[in-house]
Amino acid sequence: MRKKLKWLSFLLGFIILLFLFKYQFSNNDSWKPWSLPLSGKIIYLDPGHGGPDGGAVGGKLLEKDVTLEVAFRVRDYLQEQGALVIMTRESDTDLAPEGTKGYSRRKAEDLRQRVKLINHSEAELYISIHLNAIPSQKWSGAQSFYYGKYAENEKVAKYIQDELRRNLENTTRKAKRIHGIYLMQNVTKPGALIEVGFLSNPSEATLLGKPKYQDKVASSIYKGILRYFTEKGDPPE
């Protein structure tokens, strides 16, 4: 009889414990602290150029290679916080259909395909990653650009620019509104284009070729995206 009572007590205790456990984890307030901040967010990353289109050049460094490396690092940071990340490319290739002849035609088709991929996705945000280059060597500094179609474009660009200034400590640039960029004009999702530095500036080109600096840039972009999704109110200028 004593054995039976002991068994019943154990069983009752187990049932109570199971009920409490189930209640604790089904309660929304209790579960919130365990949720990753970007859970359920779908983000499209667009590393510029690729394949026959090398983009800007700085010594032996090609824009297409740096944009891909930075994008991979941004992807990893975002995924760690629960985001679903899609990339327009994950290798050294363009997106022009097979058989497309001629450099200019391939480039035009590549851009159309990037727009199509992003627009046909369920992404809540896109980030296009590029590098700058101009004839003068004196200009430097990462900068985010946005198209004025959506208010959200300006918001995410400003958050990312604030993080670039804060973390890289080598630019005072501000997020800038821009026109005439095919991808930005035709994408129907909020987003921004980030020029992560100038390959035409020898000192900055050297930095952009280093994995440690690439990671610093990627971390800044990631932190800006995180703030865009989690902070309320107006972003800093």
Curated annotation (Swiss-Prot):
Its EC number is 3.5.1.28. Gene3D superfamilies: Zn-dependent exopeptidases (3.40.630.40). GO terms for molecular function: N-acetylmuramoyl-L-alanine amidase activity. It catalyses: Hydrolyzes the link between N-acetylmuramoyl residues and L-amino acid residues in certain cell-wall glycopeptides. Residues 1-27 form the signal peptide. The keyword Cell membrane does not apply. NCBIfam families: spore_cwlD. CwlD and PdaA are necessary and sufficient for muramic delta-lactam production in B.subtilis spore peptidoglycan. This is Germination-specific N-acetylmuramoyl-L-alanine amidase.
